[in-house]
UniProtKB/Swiss-Prot annotation:
Protein name: Redox-sensing transcriptional repressor Rex
Cellular compartments annotated: Cytoplasm
GO molecular function: DNA binding; DNA-binding transcription factor activity
DNA-binding region of this protein: 18-57
């Protein structure tokens, strides 16, 4: 995302890829315009929030007309750097890591897992979903040219050590699937995805906030 647009709220920034994916599908279907209400129904974000999110970028639509799909597609493609390929590595080729490698961000044309790392000799030298698996001990030798993001799917006991090593190797962003809250330098961005916590939260909301 362009540096001048980083001042938008983080919650808004997280929704932009969701908007882009739906707008992309509208364009593929030949639709020429869309309203905030239609967007709301599709992405499950209320229309007022969508209008507020869009307002951070100026006049993207017209009152009474809605939004031009082609214009939105071009705008978000540029905003989300869709024409620039982002190389990603994955550390930990267990069950979850394997699933992510086989998926390999198939809906994100500009994001590709190029390398995977593990300590299991049976996995090293193989390919999972066309992604080669390398020896974790050879990380520094292989090098991470043009790679700034890592997906972390190692056992919890290895999470912090792995993160420390990734930071030293030049990684700037970590998508952390482990339950460990990583301690990293201030300039490193970490997004935590704890499936157990999300499931517990869902159970709680179902019990205490019925729809």
């Amino acid at each position: 995302m362009k540096s001048e647009q980083l001042k938008i709220p983080q919650a808004t920034a997280k929704r932009l890829p969701l908007y882009y994916r739906f707008i992309e599908s509208l364009h593929a279907a030949g639709k020429q315009r869309v309203s905030s209400t239609e967007l709301s129904q599709a992405v499950k974000v209320d229309s007022a929030t969508i209008r507020r999110d869009f307002s951070y970028f100026g006049a993207l639509g017209k009152k009474g007309y809605g939004y031009n799909v082609q214009y939105l597609l071009s705008f978000f493609r540029e905003t989300l750097d869709q024409d620039e390929r982002t190389n990603v590595i994955l550390v930990g080729v267990g069950n979850l890591g394997t699933a992510l490698l086989q998926y390999n961000f198939s809906k994100n044309n500009n994001t590709v897992i190029t390398h995977a790392f593990d300590v299991d000799e049976k996995k090293i030298g193989t390919k999972v979903g066309e992604v080669p698996v390398y020896n974790w001990d050879k990380l520094e030798e292989i090098g991470l040219q043009n790679v700034s993001i890592a997906v972390l799917t190692v056992p919890a006991s290895q999470a912090q050590k792995s993160a420390d090593r990734l930071v030293k190797a030049g990684i700037e962003g970590i998508l952390n699937f482990t339950p460990v809250r990583l301690s990293v330098p201030a300039h490193i961005r970490v997004h935590h995805i704890d499936l157990a916590v999300e499931l517990q939260a869902l159970v709680y909301f179902l019990k205490h906030y019925p729809l």
